[in-house]
Amino acid sequence: MTNQTCKAAVLTKRHTIEVMDVQMPECGRDGMIIKLEAASICGTDLHLFEEDPAYPVILGHELCGRVVEMGPDAAKSMRCYTGEVKLGDRICLYPWVVCGTCENCLTYGIGACGVCDN
């Protein structure tokens, strides 16, 4: 576990979000650390805001930022439609894992992947 911290908007109780210092995650072999420049809370997160999850919770999975650390296998495991992701790249994260080549992806868009479990 790293000793570094970063700021995060944390849901601490129902309808209460606080900016807090949180422990930075470790970068896994096939992962990357992204320094966030912008993030949003999606409509799919609202059930956590309205219900009582196991607090504290960091909401949001739609984000953009700069890649500041990459595991040794990250470039192989991350699918990027514009080429290989490199250290220092600015990226927008699309949080679905899709094939991008099946009939549903090609006909209806990648949100309708027929191969992956979305």
Where are each of the predicted segments found?
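Phosphate-binding beta-alpha-beta segment of Rossmann-like dinucleotide-binding domains, i.e.
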Residues: 95-118
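Intrinsic-disorder/low-complexity, polar/charged segments enriched in Ser/Thr/Lys/Arg/Asp/Glu/Gln
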Residues: 5, 17, 31-33
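Cytochrome P450 core scaffold surrounding the K-helix E-X-X-R motif
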Residues: 44-48
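Short structural boundary motif marking the start of a folded domain
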Residues: 2-9
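Well-ordered beta-strand positions in beta-sheet-rich domains
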Residues: 19-21
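Extracellular beta-rich ligand/substrate-recognition surface
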Residues: 9-17
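Glycine-rich beta-strand-centered segment in the early N-terminal region that forms part
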Residues: 25-39, 49-103
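Residue-level detector of conserved, well-ordered beta-strand and adjacent loop positions
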Residues: 12, 23, 68, 117
